[in-house]
Curated annotation (Swiss-Prot):
The keyword Hydrolase applies. Belongs to the Maf family. YhdE subfamily. One of its GO terms (cellular component) is cytoplasm. It comes from the Bacteria. Its main location: cytoplasm. The record marks 20, 78, 162 as: Important for substrate specificity. The active site is at residue 77. Pfam families: Maf (PF02545). This is dTTP/UTP pyrophosphatase. Its EC number is 3.6.1.9. Keywords: Cytoplasm, Hydrolase, Nucleotide metabolism.
Length: 224
């Protein structure tokens, strides 16, 4: 890993419209602009889930990097994986309901791929983070009410771990922020691999020990 000496990051450009990823970056202390990528791959079972998440993040980052000459692009992709395969964002309320009923009362994995591109020198770094979850049992009526709220429609697997009115997750092993969509420890590690030393807000210590993560202890704001 290169020496971590540079605290002066280039302009950060987040290639995502996700309000949850934006909130995580803000709470970590980053200033950034948002330029969502419209490029996206669709899972077809031809590659492993972790590889797919990484490829999708890289696709989004390169899409924005084509028109950017001065900046650090951050792109991410999060997938939910059960025994039948990858669950992305639901395409319809019906699919969201099917996803929820498929996951309820069972265990699954959440994988986030992150890609950083420094457009000033062409540096590219990618990485993944993985968490294991067990969903609580819930009735079809509960799942239907959650779908009707609209909250699941922009989330991989059709649920948000931070949605407190529904609270779908019974147990989590691994990074909470990975499930939300942007694992802080993976992001900081990739920045350090590029030679940057990001200055974080107080109480952020994402060094791989999730118990040190402030949001792990307090939960992300429900409005995100």
């Amino acid at each position: 890993m290169p020496d971590c000496q540079n605290t002066n990051l280039p302009e950060i450009i987040l290639a995502s419209a996700s309000p949850r990823r934006q909130q995580i970056l803000r709470e970590m202390g980053f200033t950034f602009s948002v330029c969502p990528s419209q490029a996206e791959l669709h899972p077809d079972g031809s590659v492993a889930p972790a590889k797919f998440a990484t490829l999708n993040a890289e696709t989004k980052a390169r899409d924005i990097a084509r028109n950017t000459r001065q900046g650090l692009i951050i792109a991410a992709d999060t997938v939910v994986v059960d025994t039948l395969g990858i669950l992305g964002k639901p395409a319809s309320p019906e699919e969201a309901l099917n996803y929820l009923l498929r996951l309820g009362g069972k265990s699954h994995t959440v994988i986030s791929g992150i890609c950083l591109i420094n457009t000033q020198n062409g540096q590219v770094r990618s990485g993944t983070c993985q968490s294991s979850l067990h969903m609580r049992p819930f009735t079809p009526a509960e799942a239907q009410r959650y779908v009707e709220s609209g909250l699941p429609m922009d989330k991989a697997g059709a649920y948000g771990i931070q949605d407190r009115e529904f609270e779908p997750v019974e147990k989590i092993e691994g990074c909470y922020l990975n499930v939300v969509g942007l694992p802080a420890c993976t992001l900081v590690r990739l920045m350090k691999e590029m030679g940057f030393c990001p200055e974080l807000h107080d109480n952020w210590q994402p060094e791989g020990d999730c118990t040190l993560c402030r949001i792990y202890r307090t939960g992300i704001n429900q409005t995100c």
